């Protein structure tokens, strides 16, 4: 079982890599479940590119810090809280603001599986609103659209990924954006090839592996 410090450091590493890759900006946030009613998340005021473990706060599902102090979570903490509330097997939630995925939702283009690793994501549903998910009601609506899928698109806004580990969630956040980039670029030439259901299943059998996630 990882220690609290190790979990915080893994979150810090993930956020800083995503920020460096321009998958998140100054407002992106990532979390990890601590138990049934609390989770770790980077503070709303933290500078993502120079994040440290001191910038990770533990909050309950209502966004209240459980260890005292005045460090507050991001305003969109309901993204994380409502996923954890609805899906007990999920242990990590990332909210990113990537370019290519957002371009597609801005124009109403549905992401398709055009890249082998995106087979792990399956259908990629999209919210029909660009508004911040900063209330429990909005979080519940997002979770309803997401269902049991690993990712959901927020129209003209960003992406939410959910997984059983920080490593897996990081990989999903990268895969969805790489898939969007390839789909967009292929659309400049013609109609992108979309993996069939059978091809996606074969890819899932080979690609669902922590050792491969680590190569992301």
PLM region descriptions:
Residues 1-216:
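Glycine-rich flexible loops
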